[in-house]
């Protein structure tokens, strides 16, 4: 049995903590994760090495390590609540994936990079790979510019459990002390859970689906944020009540579609099933 050596960048974040946990269960993988804060490395179920994407000189680390692996999966990204510096946002969201992609190409290591639906304003919805990026805020622009042509770029939106910080929607709902929570009925979403994203990566590796191109990865159904919050409440047996709420205007619809065949091959289940399968 061939063992695939996999390096997961950003193993203690929202996405990375689930990716290393799920991939480490696969006996045909040898998984190594990276950490930035030492106090979280004990939570990793795999080997780990230190890496700080905020460092201005990341090339030495990447040049030494990337070539040791069959796959590198990037789970590092600065999300909107953590955007405190334009310089750091550019380094992490734009320059890091471009640098990893170039070094991975040199070593013939396969590089899987996640990007965001927030490159779109959400004015229309049902965006495909051919649609122009029209978001002009810092997060959207840095993510848009950080989509290399020489690796596999997966555009999606994710929900899942965090190890720390707890700023994502799901953990915000779980930790909310208010018994009544507003849920937007005119904000629409068809992303996937972090556990499902881990499954996507495994299918790409196991079924040799890797291809240097950009792909939209999404659930088969679109839900409102109101419906999504209600799923969390039911899944985790919370005492909260979600109340329908609308933002002014037409709301936000960043739902994704695809003109490519990959998403169909992945057989992603509906959102209700994905939420129920969360740990």
Describe the role of every protein-language-model region.
Residues 5-26:
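N-terminal Rossmann NAD(P)H-binding glycine-rich loop of SDR-like oxidoreductase domains
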Residues 33-40, 53:
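N-terminal Rossmann-fold cofactor-binding loop
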Residues 50-94:
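NAD(P)H-binding glycine-rich loop region in Rossmannoid oxidoreductase-like domains
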Residues 88-99, 133, 141-144:
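Glycine-rich NAD(P)-binding loop of the Rossmann-fold in SDR/ketoreductase-type enzymes
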Residues 98-134:
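Conserved Rossmann-fold NAD(P)-dependent oxidoreductase catalytic core, especially the SDR/UDP-sugar
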Residues 136-138, 148-189, 195-196, 202:
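NAD(P)-dependent short-chain dehydrogenase/reductase
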Residues 198-203, 207-253:
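Mid/C-terminal beta-alpha module of Rossmann-like enzyme folds, strongest
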Residues 238-279:
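C-terminal amphipathic/interface module of NAD(P)-dependent oxidoreductases
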């Amino acid at each position: 049995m061939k063992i695939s050596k996999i390096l997961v960048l950003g193993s203690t974040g929202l996405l990375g903590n689930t990716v290393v946990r799920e991939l480490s269960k696969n006996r045909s993988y040898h998984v190594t994760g990276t950490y930035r804060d030492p106090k979280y490395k004990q939570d990793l179920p795999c080997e780990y090495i230190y890496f700080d994407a905020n460092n201005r000189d990341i090339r030495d680390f990447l040049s030494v390590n990337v070539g040791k692996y069959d796959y590198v999966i990037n789970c590092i990204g600065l999300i909107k609540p953590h955007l405190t510096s334009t310089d750091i946002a550019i380094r992490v969201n734009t320059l890091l994936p471009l640098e990893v992609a170039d070094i991975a190409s040199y070593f013939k290591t396969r590089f899987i990079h996640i990007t965001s639906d927030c490159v779109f304003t959400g004015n229309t919805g049902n965006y495909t790979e051919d649609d122009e990026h029209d978001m002009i805020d810092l997060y959207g622009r840095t993510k848009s510019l950080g989509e290399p042509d020489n690796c596999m770029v997966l555009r999606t939106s994710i929900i899942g459990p965090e190890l720390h910080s707890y700023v994502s929607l799901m953990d915000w709902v779980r930790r909310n002390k208010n018994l009544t929570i507003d849920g937007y009925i005119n904000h629409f979403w068809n992303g996937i859970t972090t556990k499902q994203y881990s499954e996507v990566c495994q299918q790409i590796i196991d079924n040799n689906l890797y291809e240097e191109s950009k792909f939209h990865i999404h659930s088969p159904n679109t839900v409102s944020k109101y419906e999504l919050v209600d799923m969390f409440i039911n899944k985790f047996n919370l005492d909260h009540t979600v109340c329908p709420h609308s933002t002014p205007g037409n709301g936000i619809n960043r739902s994704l579609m695809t003109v490519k065949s990959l998403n169909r091959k992945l057989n992603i289940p509906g959102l209700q099933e994905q939420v129920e399968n969360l740990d």
